[in-house]
Amino acid sequence: MALGDKNQGSSKSQAKQKGTKGKNAQPRLKSNQLKRLKINEELKELQSRVDNFVPPSEITLFSELPMSSKTQKGLKSSHFLNPTPIQSLAIPPALQARDILGSAKTGSGKTLAFLIPLLERLYLEKWGPMDGLGAVVISPTRELAVQTFMQLRDIGKYHNFSAGLVIGGKPLKEEQERLGRMNILIATPGRLLQHLDSTVGFDSSAVKVLVLDEADRLLDLGFLPALKAIVSHFSPVQTAPGSRPSRQTLLFSATQSKDLAALAKLSLYEPLYISCNKPGEEGVMPANLEQYYAVVPLERKLDALWGFVKSHLKMKGIVFVTSGKQVRFIFETFRRLHPGLPLMHLHGKQKQPTRLDIFQRFSSSKSALLICTDVAARGLDFPAVDWVIQLDCPDDVDTYIHRVGRTARYQSAGTALTILCPSEEEGMKTRWGEKAIEVKRIKIKEGKMGNLKQSMQNFAFKEPEIKYLGQRAFISYMKSVHIQKDKSIFKIDALPAEAFAESMGLPGAPQIKLGNQKAAKVRGPSKEELARKAEKEEEEEEERAVVGSDEESEEDESEGLGSEDEEEEIDDEAEEIDDEEESGEESGSDEETEEEKDASKPKAPAVRTKYDRMFERKNQSILTPHYTALIAHDADNAAGAGEADDDDDVFTLARRDHNLSDDEEADTDAILGAEALAAELKKPLITSEDLSKRKLKAAASKKGLLKSRPGPEKVLFDEETGEAREFYKSGVDVEKEMSAADKRREYLEKEREIMKIQDKIDKEVAREKKKELKRKRKERERELRQMEMGDEPVAYLGGDDDYASADEGRSLSPSPAPSLEPERHAKKQRRGGVQESGAGDLEDEEALALRLLQGS
């Protein structure tokens, strides 16, 4: 009954619950809808926290900031717990969609100060894969863009955004296919502008966050027109009053300049100025940085650097020089000297995979030396850099600040050393004083400096490539000093050019024409200059040879316009124009008449096809026309402008007026015609001038050289005399000697004689072995017979010592091997079950044992 009542009561309660559900219950929701509602509630709560957030006086943890759980989780997994001063000041207003213009010392964490607001803004906007591009970060160099991308990937790995890297050095078509799927884009300005202008379907009107990293460097590289064009593609900043701006702009830099104000007016809307420096100390140095400078003559700078490297073999350092030509020259020469420290080099002319590989290898190395240009001076965070050596004087104090900022990052210690020429000391000290930067002077002892003069001369003498690199490095350094604006520091007349060239292993200073090339780095060559250069290349082969070979390499490597490569390419163009003008003057351009000048007026450049570019290819090694032009300059200076070159092996014959008869003249003409025809036939049908650069490279490769070289010769050495003789002989020598059948017969006879001698020796050895075995068998039989007869064994001491010593242990004991009769007899006795034993046998055995013991 109780069980029935219980069941009845439960059924009633279930019916009651069903009735209530049918009247008051809400409709059932799917899991996706619940998840969406939960996300919306979290976003509303986060937005209210951001709007109502009042930053405290000091923020010590990232968890105190109003950020999403995904960003907090990414920061914690990357071990970012405590914000730096610039981060604690810039992140709270940036989270509220304010435009920021921030300035802080190098290594203070400016990258996180704009990456965190970028992620939070897109997260609050519910940005998804179908929304397109939402944030853009513009960096001045490729390496800095790669570093920013890696940092974004670490802290944003828990978000669902797609990020991409668009820099030079990669095919444009591959990047165009991926642009439509990117939410966050990190790019260099040149390549980004190229995509904005040419990529079909690339919509950038919905960008919510624009970041300009190292903005002053972007302006120094002449990217202001490109930045104006890029900003024009994005959505406008101003919106309705009281609402959130449609686009937020964050601008960060380590130094402030006048041009930043123009850029701020262009892209920022009511910006908030944030600076972690004290008033009047913009660009102040890190507290843990020790700064020194040394005054060294120009011709001893390489000696000072070599001595420093040899005395710091366990350090991790960066050496800054002015141009990529100097980087290559120092790297190639120091590499051949084997300093005992890993050497790496980085400059703007390298291919992008090579630059990334060097960047990663140097970052992961504990001790290494990186020789580089200013391409690595901005924003790159190399861990644990101990020394920064500036072998060349920096352009200005801002460049100095960014160079030395590669060490002493955040709270780590570092040391900076600047090597100045005597003429640069006073001007640089004045500029340091204006920025309140204290740099101590040190003196390098003579014993600590190296002596590379003889080694450099040997390298230049043995390897023409090193000599060519030295000439280009010398020219690029002198031109970089010439185009500097601050003439109180850079005085080209005070530099010892001849001594500097001699220290680089050169026989003399190369000829340089320093024309009035104002603002050459900014504007590049004009259209008239390019047209004049094309006209001269078509007219004279000599002038075409003077033009440098770097033009083709620049065309291949300058796919990415937004990088440090642009500045170096413009420098090389200006250098080629100077060389061309110099060669034009040497070839007699001063003697042109008015008619020739009118005829050589620049024409409108025609369309260049791929076949035109194919015929314009030039060598890029020591066979470059520019290198031959440098050699020609030296020869002209030595022999005079009007004299012929000594290297020419062609004799010029002057015709004399002799009284010749008609027959003699006819004979002479016939002889001369035959000689000319023979000389013409001796000439090759195809010369190197008729081949393309690809064919010349293939001929210079290992495979091509092996084809042109003669085959290897096999040499045999006589076993008796040791004399070498050829394995293969010519047909005449073979005919003089005996035939092949006679040689085989002679060889077989010699081998038969040798085999007969060996057979005799083998037979004698076999005969001796048989005799010895027979003798040993007879000895054992004799011993056994004596033991059976009861006599004492006889020890034979004569004969061979080897056999006596070998049988010494067993000569006194019976061996069962020679005869099996005792064993058979014993077996028969055991088989019969009766074994005769008696006192006589036992006594005999005891006596035998006693005799054996006494005999032994």
From Swiss-Prot:
GO terms for cellular component: nucleolus; nucleus; small-subunit processome. ATP binds at residues 104-111. Residues 1-34, 509-612, 768-856 are annotated as: Disordered. Residues 288-460 form the Helicase C-terminal domain. It is found in: Nucleus, Nucleolus. Residues 7-17 have a biased composition (Polar residues). Residues 91-274 form the Helicase ATP-binding domain. It catalyses: ATP + H2O = ADP + phosphate + H(+). Its main location: nucleus. SMART domains: DEXDc, DUF4217, HELICc. Interacts with the U3 and U14 snoRNAs. Associates with pre-ribosomal complexes. The Q motif is unique to and characteristic of the DEAD box family of RNA helicases and controls ATP binding and hydrolysis. Belongs to the DEAD box helicase family. DDX10/DBP4 subfamily. This is ATP-dependent RNA helicase DBP4. It comes from Cryptococcus neoformans var. neoformans serotype D (strain JEC21 / ATCC MYA-565). The gene is DBP4.
